[in-house]
């Protein structure tokens, strides 16, 4: 992000955040909000003035009546602060504005919460007074970062030959992954428009219309359950390209995201964008959006315990993780982790402390010497480590250990650099329902992997669950940034998939005839 300041308009000649000792002697006019006022004797006061660029100290007459969050215009002379009064926590901390004349532009009631970054305020209160919350430095930085990201993405997409096309906001309802928000039609009572969950059909029409390479910073709306990282409205970089495959789109997006990262975080330049299959991600990290900034990978132990005398392990999927130096965790903490694992769906959690000669564990007496030695060897355990094992169905084991590794070791988002990762080869179907039909992992319009078309034609449940799709996700430090897929363009394959999920020919023609 750039530190350059735009030209000042009208009532101001400078921005608060740009003043430095090099401006000493310059007559300036500033506009902003009163952040704080401090009395300094009977006839002198210091006022911190804030605008979107930062805060600067102004020296004012003690008789001037200004209060927190009043909007004012200040004229005065920039000077270097006296030695010993500098404020190193401010970018402007070596300068101040003296001999100030203050013009009150707007008075204000006391703010509903403090605006300094040191004070945590309940989010409900912040949202109720969002216009005040937006004045905080963090929110201003977020808005500028968002604008910088959008500009970088636009520039990169245009350099790669894509054309920005705005698509309609009012459309007919189409099958998507969530419920629609609807808008009643004034001209057609009883009928409704839907707000777009994505511009999918419109961008496909752009391809039919010869646009060839389309993109849009698109506003999307989905009526789904709210979470910390999921809201009704969101913005996405949406794109489509004709005569392109998965590798082409991944390359385009890698270029665009790299350009965006260079503008937002030039000191944290990302390295490679490695690939990992969905299966490997689930087996090694227990998640399809793994945080690869740290280890604690899941290790397969099922074969070791296939014929175990310990009933909880025998014949189950068994995996473990090694926590370096974790043997020092208290019994209370281990009990907390066990309870957490049960809440996540496990029957229990086996822990083992690695000692010089043996493994200290409540279940050690139920395991053979060969099994204990095998655990130690396969997990590459060292003295002082903690080993955590879960035995259950494979889906449960992966899920629980995947969450445990995050619970134990996930670093803050700001640490460890930018670790981008492409997840590829998602399954086309995630399960078989009670009627024996496959359940699409995403939607029934994703192109199967070309090497798995024979499995699709077989129709057996085992084969269908082995079909990979041409779907892909981009992950950053354990968070899904976005996803995409190659759509089915051959009517025969589309018919096959729709038939497999239980849609008859008449319904196909009625709902999806334009695709067939």
Each predicted region: which residue ranges?
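Class II aminoacyl-tRNA synthetase catalytic cores and aaRS-like
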Residues: 1-516
């Amino acid at each position: 992000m750039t530190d350059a300041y735009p030209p000042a308009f009208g009532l101001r000649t400078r921005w608060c955040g740009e003043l430095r000792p090099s401006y000493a002697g310059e007559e300036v006019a500033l506009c902003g909000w009163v952040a704080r006022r401090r009395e300094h004797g009977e006839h002198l006061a210091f006022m911190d003035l804030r605008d979107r660029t930062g805060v600067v100290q102004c020296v004012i007459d003690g008789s001037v009546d200004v209060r927190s969050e009043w909007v004012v215009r200040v004229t005065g002379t920039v000077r270097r602060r006296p030695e010993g009064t500098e404020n190193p926590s401010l970018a402007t901390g070596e300068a101040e504005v003296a001999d100030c004349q203050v013009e009150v532009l707007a008075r204000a009631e006391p703010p509903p919460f403090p605006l300094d970054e040191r004070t945590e305020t309940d989010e409900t209160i912040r949202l109720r007074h969002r216009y005040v919350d937006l004045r905080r430095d963090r929110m201003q930085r977020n808005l500028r970062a968002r604008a910088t990201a959008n500009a970088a993405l636009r520039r990169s997409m245009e350099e790669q030959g894509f054309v920005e096309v705005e698509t309609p906001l009012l459309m007919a309802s189409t099958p998507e992954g969530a419920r629609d928000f609807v808008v009643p039609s004034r001209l057609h009572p009883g009928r409704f428009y839907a707000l777009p969950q994505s511009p999918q059909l419109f961008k496909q029409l752009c391809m039919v219309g010869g646009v060839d390479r389309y993109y849009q910073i698109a506003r999307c709306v989905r009526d789904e359950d709210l979470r910390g990282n999921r809201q009704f409205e969101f913005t996405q970089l949406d794109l489509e390209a004709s005569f392109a495959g998965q590798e082409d789109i991944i390359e385009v997006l890698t270029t665009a995201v790299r350009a965006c990262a260079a503008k937002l975080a030039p000191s944290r330049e990302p390295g490679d964008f490695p690939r990992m299959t969905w299966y490997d991600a689930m087996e090694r990290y227990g998640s399809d959006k793994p945080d690869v900034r740290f280890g604690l990978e899941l290790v397969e132990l099922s074969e070791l315990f296939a014929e175990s005398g310990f009933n909880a392990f025998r014949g189950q999927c068994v995996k473990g993780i090694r926590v370096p130096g974790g043997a020092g965790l208290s019994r209370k903490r281990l009990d907390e982790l066990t309870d957490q694992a049960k809440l996540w769906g496990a029957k229990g959690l086996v822990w083992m402390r690695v000692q010089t000669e043996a493994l200290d564990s409540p279940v050690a007496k139920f395991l053979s010497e060969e099994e204990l030695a095998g655990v130690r060897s396969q997990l590459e355990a060292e003295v002082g480590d903690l080993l955590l094992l879960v035995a259950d169905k494979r889906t449960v084991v992966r899920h629980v250990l995947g969450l445990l590794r995050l619970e134990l070791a996930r670093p803050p988002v700001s640490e460890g650099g930018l670790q981008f990762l492409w997840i590829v080869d998602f399954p086309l179907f995630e399960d078989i329902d009670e009627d024996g039909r496959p359940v699409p992992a995403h939607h029934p319009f994703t192109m199967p992997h070309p090497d798995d078309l024979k499995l699709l034609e077989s129709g057996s449940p085992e084969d269908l669950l082995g079909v990979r799709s041409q779907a892909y996700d981009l992950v950053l430090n354990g968070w899904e940034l976005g996803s995409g897929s190659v759509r089915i363009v051959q009517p025969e394959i589309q018919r096959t998939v729709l038939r497999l999920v239980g849609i008859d020919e008449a319904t196909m023609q009625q709902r999806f005839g334009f695709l067939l």
